Amino acid sequence: MAIRKYKPTTPGRRGASVSDFAEITRSTPEKSLVRPLHGKGGRNAHGRITTRHKGGGHKRAYRVIDFRRHDKDGVDAKVAHIEYDPNRTANIALLHYLDGEKRYIIAPYGLKQGAIVESGANADIKPGNNLPLRNIPAGTVIHAVELRPGGGAKLARSAGVSIQLLGKEGSYASLRMPSGEIRRVDVRCRATVGEVGNAEQANINWGKAGRMRWKGKRPTVRGVVMNPVDHPHGGGEGKTSGGRHPVSPWGKPEGRTRKPNKPSDKLIVRRRRTGKKR
């Protein structure tokens, strides 16, 4: 994928860029793998905002992605199309299996239309093939990794990211995450070989606020420009700095959003570098 820059015909177009979609081979999704997607606007079942800055945006249809692939072991599949997916940063690949079934997977870098992919313990080590970590050599770059055997891919699914398999010891494999964190995962967990494609997506300059609204992202207003009734940093005569340590609109100190006693933390060998004191 390459980035195409717009000519500066308007202030919103100046500096803006877009993907050239050169890898995309079909513009309409497979009907049997599409489900309706209803926007919630960041609201919960009571109608209250639980996630701010969400709402609006272009209507989308959800593409059902196969994040497991274990039930297709030993069945070869041909890559019929590389398609755009509005619900994620990565592109997706439509597979036609020899038994007649069609499924979507996340498209890894280098996977082309017409390629043959497979899954299972005896699959070759090449992009798009899915197999257990115990059957993947150390040093291999992988993506779409399970956290628990049979639980479906949870790690490294965004455009351009990858995980490196550092080694295996006993029933665990050591993985270097995109953040730099080193984590142990059960060797029975499955992963797909290669890195996720569409890496240039990170270099897109959106150019104007309107394009973010098309994506369903609403403005983020700073607390210091609000009134005291709306935010702890609000109010004051003239321009102020907030006058206190940063807090949320509900008075909670900023940062430290991770659960401190998460059970899976015991499998972290080395934490990611955050730049914060712990």
UniProtKB/Swiss-Prot annotation:
Please list the GO terms describing molecular function: rRNA binding; structural constituent of ribosome; transferase activity
UniProt keyword annotations, A-Z: Ribonucleoprotein, Ribosomal protein, RNA-binding, rRNA-binding
Q: Where is this region: Disordered?
A: 27-58, 224-278
Keyword RNA-binding attached: yes
One Pfam entry name? Ribosomal_L2_C
Bias kind Basic and acidic residues: ranges: 253-268
**Gene Ontology cellular-component terms listed:** large ribosomal subunit
Q: Which GO terms describe its biological process?
A: cytoplasmic translation
Instruction: Please indicate which superkingdom the organism of origin belongs to.
Output: Bacteria
* Keyword set includes Transmembrane: no
Q: Assembly state and interactors?
A: Part of the 50S ribosomal subunit. Forms a bridge to the 30S subunit in the 70S ribosome.
Q: Indicate what this protein is called per its UniProt record.
A: Large ribosomal subunit protein uL2
What is the organism field in this record?
Answer: Mycobacterium sp. (strain KMS)
Gene that this sequence comes from:
rplB
